[in-house]
Amino acid sequence: MEKKKLSLTFRMLRLLGLNYSEEEYGQVSLWNVIKRVVKTYRDGFLLKYMMNSWLLSPISPRKLRPWVLRKIGCKVGKDVFIGDSVKVDSGHADLIYIGDHAHITGGCRLLCHQRDLSNYYVGDDAAKLPYRLGEIHIGKGCMIGMESMIMPGVTIGEGAIVGAFSLVTKDIPAWTIATGRPAKVVKQIPQRDNQES
C-alpha cells in the first residue's frame, strides 16, 4: 500500500510537538489550520461567555444555551433545556444530536472523542495514540441527570432518563432509566394504562 505524502503544514505541526492524527490532518493546509484556530476561539468564547454568563442570566437559558450550541455546530431540537455549566466537545460539535424536549441538566459533559486504546501496549506512549470519534444522539424527551458524562458513540433512546453522576459508555434504550458508572439500565418505564383517568 502506497503511503500518502504528508503536507508541509502537518509536518510543521508535528515538529512543534502537536499530536494530530495522520488520517484526519495529514493533508491539512495552512488555510484550514487558520480557519480551525479561529473557529476554536470563537466557539470557546461563545461557550465561556454566553453559556454561563451572569450578565446574560436574565435571558432565558431555554433560548440562549440551545442557540449557542447550534452556533458551534450541534444539532439541537425544539424546546431543549441546557443547564448551567454543561460542557460539549466543541472541536467535534457537529457530532452531537439533541432531540426535541430533551433536558441536559447542570454540569453534564458531552464528549465525542477519546483515545483509541485498541493498539495500546506496554511501553507505548498513551499521548501519541490516535483519537476515536463517535456521534452522540440524545433522543426526544430524554433527561440527563446532573454531572453525567456521555462518551463517544452513544445513543440515548427517546424518553430515557440518565441518573445524576452517571458515565454513559453504551447505548441506553428508549423509555428506560439508567444510572451508575458505567450506566446500566435499572428500570423500564411502563406504558400508561388507558383506563386510568
Predicted segments, located by residue:
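Terminal amphipathic alpha-helical/low-complexity segments used for targeting or macromolecular assembly
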Residues: 1-72, 114-118, 141, 181-197
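Sequence/structural signature of small/polar-enriched beta-strand/turn repeats
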Residues: 54, 72, 76, 96, ...
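Conserved short histidine dyad/triad with adjacent acidic residue
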Residues: 59, 81-82
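Short acidic capping loops at alpha-helix termini that bridge into adjacent secondary structure
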Residues: 78-79, 100, 140, 158-159, ...
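Glycine-centered loop/turn positions within well-structured domains
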Residues: 94, 166, 174-176, 184
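Short-chain dehydrogenase/reductase
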Residues: 143, 161, 177-179
